[in-house]
Amino acid sequence: EIPTEWKPILEFFDEVWCPSRFIQKAVASKTNKPVHYFPVSVDFPIPCGFDRGYFNLPQNTFLFLLVFDFKSHYSRKNPIACINAFAKAFPKGNEPVGLIIKSMDGDKYSKEFQALLYEAEEDSRIVSIDATYKPDEVLGLMQVCDAFVSLHRAEGFGHCIAQSMLLGKPAIVTNYSGNTDFTRPNNSC
């Protein structure tokens, strides 16, 4: 559901175009105007020149990646669920796996960022990177990791999920919201 305070803004438009059926349904519930689904194209040049050394990541380790921006509502992105799932899947602590949590703007959300760091510090295989990367660096990071994880509570579209899948990475994602337009049992879990 979209915020009620957005409803007056909808009056300025003749129609609304939405990047996912999830958003289309949410917007349509708040207006009588036409609301159309227009899928987003995901296309980019394949990044080159990046390796794990560029990001100071371990070699010979299967790396799961989560990418999010603190401005996109920390609780909605649900990074603690990723940490908990990682710990449950690999409880011994000696499996050759790692979880890379790439965030940005943690300094502007210190309470949430500190909670994330506290949870991440419990397992030395979890690496937290809070930095602003150029778009090709984010794609390069996706490329050098082995799988993408998003245990979100809601995604409008799921751009990072789509990008990682286009790079050929397995996606482990919540079966809810905007990403369900393109994440299916035959291409993700």
Give short role names for the model-derived ranges.
Residues 48-64, 91-94:
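Nucleotide-sugar donor-binding and catalytic loop/hinge architecture
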Residues 110-139:
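Nucleotide-activated donor-binding/catalytic signature segment of Leloir-type glycosyltransferases, i.e.
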Residues 153:
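Aromatic "clamp/platform" in nucleotide-sugar-dependent glycosyltransferases that forms part
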